[in-house]
């Protein structure tokens, strides 16, 4: 599996690369931190590991650029003890977040969980779902409503798929977290909240503001 490791600390880059390669990850680095996108497009990685603090442009900037062209999963690394970094990364479309210093085994567990849910997760063979007056194309991570189309991240689409398949029923937070992150012991409860809020903002763009209801203390429900 190809990994793009966007990390300017060469000591950490070398240590991480050696550890990840023992787990059959093929690690690619950045030659020019002024042009991360060229390397991203040439490698076409399965997952991006993105440091927050980088030369010239930070990891948030490059995440925005990547999200303009791709839904490739992104895991953030940060040495800053700032909860807003985690919130910002999730709002930009990151899939997970690890604060430095970290246990390498935790990082590997997160990478493996991301790979399973993004590339192997499927509730059944049907790839198109009808919901209210919209069509979910699961293969393209898109929603079509009348003449409007929006695109979701892999995480957002999995959440919505699970909710839509249980329309008018509560899907618990624990059920969603377990399906999305197999290593849920390492996941902040806020991570799911941020992803659901981001999904709601996108649905609002196609006039589906109240399509997902929060059931306080329980979970979420998609109205049919």
From Swiss-Prot:
Cellular compartments annotated: Cytoplasm
Entries under CDD domains matching the protein: REC_OmpR_NsrR-like (cd18159), trans_reg_C (cd00383)
Pfam families registered for this protein in UniProt: Response_reg, Trans_reg_C
Gene Ontology CC annotations of this record: cytosol; protein-DNA complex
Ubl conjugation found in the keyword field: no
Disulfide cysteine pairs (residue numbers): none
PROSITE patterns reported for this sequence: OMPR_PHOB (PS51755), RESPONSE_REGULATORY (PS50110)
GO BP: regulation of DNA-templated transcription; response to antibiotic
Residues modified to 4-aspartylphosphate: 51
Sorted UniProt keywords: Activator, Antibiotic resistance, Cytoplasm, DNA-binding, Phosphoprotein, Repressor, Transcription, Transcription regulation, Two-component regulatory system, Virulence
Domain of life assignment: Bacteria
Main location: cytoplasm
InterPro entries membership: CheY-like_superfamily, OmpR/PhoB-type_DNA-bd, Sig_transdc_resp-reg_C-effctor, Sig_transdc_resp-reg_receiver, WalR-like, WH-like_DNA-bd_sf
DNA-binding residues: 126-224
Response regulatory domain mapped to chain residues: 2-115
GO MF annotations in UniProt: phosphorelay response regulator activity; transcription cis-regulatory region binding
Iron-sulfur recorded as keyword: no
Post-translational note: Phosphorylated by GraS.
Function, as annotated: Member of the two-component regulatory system GraR/GraS involved in resistance against cationic antimicrobial peptides (CAMPs).
PANTHER family: REGULATOR OF RPOS (PTHR48111), SENSORY TRANSDUCTION PROTEIN BCER (PTHR48111:SF27)
Protein name (database record): Response regulator protein GraR
Gene: graR
């Amino acid at each position: 599996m190809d990994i793009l490791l966007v990390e300017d600390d060469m000591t950490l880059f070398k240590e991480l690369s050696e550890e990840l390669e023992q787990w059959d990850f093929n690690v690619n680095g950045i030659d020019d931190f002024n042009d991360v996108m060229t390397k991203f497009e040439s490698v076409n990685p399965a997952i991006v590991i993105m440091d927050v603090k980088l030369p010239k442009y930070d990891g948030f900037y490059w995440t925005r650029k990547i999200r303009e062209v791709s839904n490739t999963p992104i895991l953030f690394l940060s040495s800053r003890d700032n909860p807003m970094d985690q919130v910002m990364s999730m709002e930009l479309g990151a899939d997970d977040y690890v604060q430095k210093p970290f246990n390498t085994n935790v990082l590997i567990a997160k990478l493996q969980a991301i790979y399973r849910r993004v590339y192997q997760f499927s509730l059944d063979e049907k790839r198109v779902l009808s919901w209210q007056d919209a069509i979910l194309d699961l293969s393209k991570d898109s929603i079509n409503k009348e003449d409007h189309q929006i695109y979701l991240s892999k995480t957002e689409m999995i959440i919505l798929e699970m909710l839509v398949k249980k329309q008018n029923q509560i899907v618990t937070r624990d059920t969603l977290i377990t399906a999305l992150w197999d290593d849920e012991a390492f996941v902040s409860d806020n991570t799911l909240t941020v992803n659901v809020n981001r999904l709601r903002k996108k649905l609002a763009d196609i006039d589906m503001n109240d399509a997902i209801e929060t059931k306080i203390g329980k979970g979420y429900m998609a109205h049919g």
